[in-house]
């Protein structure tokens, strides 16, 4: 695919793969199971964060040396995740010089039925800063 | 307004045993969090550094996801020690402030506290540090809902 994102080791630990979009897919498996037959909330939060960071990195792909650091995240859990693939995608609400505000969503068979969402604030570090903040 | 349940004395709920059980299975098992200590309304767990939990290959800093999972588990256990028994619950929301990056190779300690308990909702907060509780790496706040209370 060639596109970002190169997943960090933790992304591989969760079994996440990236598709066009970017769309993030986390298959069900023992290592992401919480209570029996359900996806663990921590794994869902991890998927949402990886989708949020990955989508910001995708938006920054033309800027060599740019990277981000998480400031905070708020995760809402809306439905239990069942024994099937979980998908996640993110929207960059604002990409400033220093701060990115991102919203990420996770669902399973029906994109309209969210199982979790996250709002994330990230610090953006650009190689050469300039322009409006 | 709902009356909060007062903190109960330590009873049947054994966080040592439950941590061992929970950590033997699934995502918590893969993370491998260990029991450290507990009080009447708090539980402390430890997460050892592992290369596969790294979030940034360049800096070798632990990803934020495992810190959320650790705090979710520590705060969940805190609700049960405060209640004095296990009660099925679901996480409604969890907010994490990443105060600074954890130092690579260091074990992360997660301190979870249940500061208010009603019949249906548990309010929790906590922090994580990598050696010095006065210099935390993360602060969390969240709520749980009891799933089997009418």
Segments (PLM) and residue ranges:
Chain B
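Hydrophobic beta-strand-centered segment that forms part of the acyl-chain substrate-binding groove
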Residues: 76-109, 114
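Compact, glycine-rich, soluble single-domain proteins
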Residues: 58-76
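N-terminal structural module
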Residues: 18-40
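HotDog/MaoC-like acyl-thioester-processing domains
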Residues: 2-12, 102-109, 113-150
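A generic structural signal for short beta-strands and their flanking turns/coil linkers
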Residues: 29-31, 41-43, 88-94, 106, ...
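Short, solvent-exposed helix-to-loop capping segments enriched in aromatics
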Residues: 15-25, 77-86
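Catalytic strand-loop segment that frames the active site of acyl-thioester-processing enzymes
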Residues: 32-62
